[in-house]
Amino acid sequence: MNNAANTGTTNESNVSDAPRIEPLPSLNDDDIEKILQPNDIFTTDRTDASTTSSTAIEDIINPSLDPQSAASPVPSSSFFHDSRKPSTSTHLVRRGTPLGIYQTNLYGHNSRENTNPNSTLLSSKLLAHPPVPYGQNPDLLQHAVYRAQPSSGTTNAQPRQTTRRYQSHKSRPAFVNKLWSMLNDDSNTKLIQWAEDGKSFIVTNREEFVHQILPKYFKHSNFASFVRQLNMYGWHKVQDVKSGSIQSSSDDKWQFENENFIRGREDLLEKIIRQKGSSNNHNSPSGNGNPANGSNIPLDNAAGSNNSNNNISSSNSFFNNGHLLQGKTLRLMNEANLGDKNDVTAILGELEQIKYNQIAISKDLLRINKDNELLWQENMMARERHRTQQQALEKMFRFLTSIVPHLDPKMIMDGLGDPKVNNEKLNSANNIGLNRDNTGTIDELKSNDSFINDDRNSFTNATTNARNNMSPNNDDNSIDTASTNTTNRKKNIDENIKNNNDIINDIIFNTNLANNLSNYNSNNNAGSPIRPYKQRYLLKNRANSSTSSENPSLTPFDIESNNDRKISEIPFDDEEEEETDFRPFTSRDPNNQTSENTFDPNRFTMLSDDDLKKDSHTNDNKHNESDLFWDNVHRNIDEQDARLQNLENMVHILSPGYPNKSFNNKTSSTNTNSNMESAVNVNSPGFNLQDYLTGESNSPNSVHSVPSNGSGSTPLPMPNDNDTEHASTSVNQGENGSGLTPFLTVDDHTLNDNNTSEGSTRVSPDIKFSATENTKVSDNLPSFNDHSYSTQADTAPENAKKRFVEEIPEPAIVEIQDPTEYNDHRLPKRAKK
């Protein structure tokens, strides 16, 4: 058979969407009779023996689906003789099968109009070559025609050519309708619009289009899915020069075109169908056929177009030629071109994905840049805040240091001789009994007898060494090599005498040996929690008041006795501590310390080096272990007793703190002050003791109007203080078992009468050590027995800030704070009740 399969009317090709072959419905007898050709339709021109055994029946449309379908008239015999002549067959009127019911073009081939009627139609040739299941036959045009099924009861096959004409009023895809509505909506023109020529549309802003337009028409907001659907329905992106740039922004214009999607041509939308994948694109049509204006598809007859048996197999050569068959209803591409198209589409999709990723990365970089800037800003703000806080802390520390006393490391009689040499020698002694912990506190001192009787004592050994070195007959062997300081004193006699004199002077005038040790600690940056004070000197009277006169008698000191004799010290006044407004703290100049602490020869009488040498050489027999020591002690005590006696008398008379207190003069008749009377009430309003002592007062009771004592000694100069100072002593014989006069209890502002009742324990105040410059200030005043006590307490124990120090009875110089440097800063003192 030649081209029998190609005869008939034009068949539309939009019915190939179904994936499988469905069975044909059964036909009624009347319909079969109307359709079948008469028995003489086949002459002896061309008959095939293999087809005479059965009759092939065409695939006829079910009349129930198309009631108006009618059978075609019987053609004449000349029709078969002239089957090779091209002619248009219009004698068959067939209805197009609805989409998806009958798969006429199962493998993607359209029904082609062919006016070349062969002498035979679909005969048993189709039966001899049964169809292969869908997707398994490589012959693309083998199943392009309807298959005939055998009809029982007939011996001669009477097949006839059947063609299928499809109607054009089929439904459009939903995507096409939505896209058409989207473009014709005036509210969307800012984001999607027609091109100027009307043959394509443009998406102006992809980001806004995705978020505003797509959710209104579709169930997603994915632009990539929208582009994929456009490609499935035959749209192509119009490429421009900038489209492939990886640096293009998200606002690039996207332009798509489709030859059947034109502005104002809604009728062309029916020709837009969904394309198949790469495996089925060669079997599915890409356009809609027009039954009125069908175009013939020329086939290449080089493979044997004259032979009807080769008509079906000639489809391979048709697709291998690579022809693009275009028409109003149909557009085909060969297999190679379809593959290339899919590859290009995939590449474009990958490029779009890369572009999206690049945009996302750019946004991330911008965000990271902003975060980095914010972090730097916060860092600068934190740095500025840290700077301001540091400045505030510095101001706070300056303020705190301005309201605390001076941290001057000044000791009593500091500066006698060379302080460093004295401190080194005192520190080298291993018998003083000091225990310094990490904080630099001093625990306690040993008793006097252990201090004096200890053979390892550095002071007694130093005295012996000095005497031996000054002796005319001494030699190196006479020096005690076991002594701690012997090795250093062998070199120079004068140097040894000078050093020994310094040590003896320290013993005489210092109340406590711990003063020099604390000064040594201050020079070595050792910490000390003792409250610092400005120093001022006050001498203590050793002699009994009954024997205190112009020529006071001396009470010999028994070396072997271990009496509980206490040298009085300066107590601390709680009330004045609370009311005292210390002047602002200023850093201490270390250069002024030596001159400030240097011993004043006009104030005290000291043995010079020449005197010591002279006395040592002329009276060598008198220089035993204690002669040199006691000579100096007695000499200074004689002068200090007279001076202290005069001071005590003046204090009792001129004390402003006790205006109604009676003063009982229990002193001896040798008292030099004639103004003192027994049982006399003394009231000296407006008198300032410190002004009196310093001679700077303008009051009529000035020190210049008071006669000096008979001994010729002048009162000890005391610093000036504008506040009302009061001091009193109760001279009571027999109160002190050691023969000493009742001592003056003096703090940094007030001289108080320190009378103790019977049965009570007499306590001595703390010696006010000076803290080092670089140690922190502590308000606690540690003692040798009680190491700490807070001065901030409202009520303190009586002896909380006092301690006992066992020493030899000697005139003591006690350091008290000088109020002259902060007169203008002090608060008015309350009158003591």
From Swiss-Prot:
Q: Domain of life of the organism in this record?
A: Eukaryota
On this chain, the residues bearing Phosphoserine are 450, 458, 471, 478, 528
Database matches in Pfam families: HSF_DNA-bind
Where, subcellularly, is it found? Nucleus
Query: Which parts of the sequence carry N-acetylmethionine?
Result: 1
> Which GO MF terms are attached to this record?
DNA binding; DNA-binding transcription factor activity; sequence-specific DNA binding
Free-text description of this protein's post-translational modifications in UniProt: Exhibits temperature-dependent phosphorylation that activates the transcriptional capacity.
Report the record's Gene Ontology biological process terms.
cellular response to heat; negative regulation of TORC1 signaling; positive regulation of transcription by RNA polymerase II; regulation of establishment of protein localization to chromosome; regulation of transcription by RNA polymerase II; regulation of translation in response to stress; response to heat
One Gene Ontology cellular component term attached to this UniProt record is: nucleus
Specify where the region named Involved in trimerization lies, as residue ranges.
350-403
Question: InterPro entries from the xrefs?
Answer: HSF_DNA-bd, WH-like_DNA-bd_sf, WH_DNA-bd_sf
PANTHER family for this protein: HEAT SHOCK FACTOR PROTEIN (PTHR10015:SF427), HEAT SHOCK TRANSCRIPTION FACTOR (PTHR10015)
Q: Its biological function? A: DNA-binding transcription factor that specifically binds heat shock promoter elements (HSE) and activates transcription.
Instruction: Name the protein family.
Output: Belongs to the HSF family.
* Protein name from the UniProt record: Heat shock transcription factor
The organism named in the record is Saccharomyces cerevisiae (strain ATCC 204508 / S288c)
